């Protein structure tokens, strides 16, 4: 059996196990420590955050993964990587600005504004994490490692510092820290392992994405 296939299979297996185990551990812990009301407010805020993530991610990861898989040349991969990251960065700025406006005008969101502000790191970390690149080059181990970082850091911080319902806002903050750490790790791998630099893309490259 192909070595790369075995490696990717093992990486995906570990990834799926990780994605299953961490929620099983953390959700009962949070409901117990925060209580139903505080946990409900956190969960509602997180759902809004994920809507923004879905909008920013929409279509990009599939098309970008395909483009990376079709082009093995360093020059083209660097252009694709830079273009996708640039567009996502612009979208992050626009949608985070819109989120701040929503917080200021919608009373339900305004009352828990700090949750959304702390959740901005989740939006940035998840949308700018180049998992699509690793999928395109079939290097799933880096996704598994980054995902483990994303899951482990919040878990440890939550267990150490979340004591009661007043700490609900910190759950969002700790998750943001985890996503930002995973994003940073992934970007460093792209930069130093695969020697891809971020360059301002040409207008025609932006239009093709």
Model-inferred region functions:
Residues 4-61, 100, 155:
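Signature of the first transmembrane helix
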Residues 16, 20, 47-50, 92, ...:
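Residue-level recognition of pore/gate-forming positions within transmembrane alpha-helices
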Residues 34-45, 71-83, 93-124, 164-172:
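Membrane-interface helix-capping segments at transmembrane helix termini in multi-pass transporters
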Residues 1-5, 141, 168-175, 184-209:
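Interhelical loop/hinge segments that connect adjacent transmembrane helices in multipass membrane
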Residues 113, 117-120, 145-192:
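Hydrophobic alpha-helical transmembrane segments
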Residues 57-72:
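Helix-loop junctions and terminal segments of transmembrane helices
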Residues 123-145:
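Membrane-interface junctions at transmembrane-helix termini in multi-pass inner-membrane proteins
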């Amino acid at each position: 059996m192909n070595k790369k296939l075995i490696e990717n299979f093992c990486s995906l297996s570990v990834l799926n196990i990780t994605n299953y185990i961490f929620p099983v551990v953390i959700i009962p812990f949070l409901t117990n420590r925060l209580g139903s009301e505080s946990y409900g407010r956190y969960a509602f805020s997180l759902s809004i955050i994920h809507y923004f993530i879905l909008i920013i991610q929409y279509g990009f990861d599939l098309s970008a993964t395909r483009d990376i898989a079709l082009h093995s040349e360093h020059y083209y991969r660097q252009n694709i990587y830079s273009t996708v990251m640039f567009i996502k960065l612009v979208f992050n700025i626009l949608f985070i600005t819109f989120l701040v406006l929503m917080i200021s005008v919608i009373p339900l969101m305004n009352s828990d504004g700090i949750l959304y502000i702390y959740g901005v790191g989740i939006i940035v970390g998840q949308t700018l994490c180049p998992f699509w690149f690793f999928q395109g080059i079939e290097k799933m181990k880096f996704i598994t490692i980054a995902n483990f970082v994303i899951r482990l850091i919040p878990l440890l911080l939550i267990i150490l510092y979340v004591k009661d319902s007043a700490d609900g806002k910190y759950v969002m903050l700790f998750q943001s820290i985890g996503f930002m750490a995973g994003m940073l790790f992934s970007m460093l791998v792209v930069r130093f392992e695969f020697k891809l630099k971020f360059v301002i893309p040409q207008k025609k490259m932006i239009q093709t994405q």
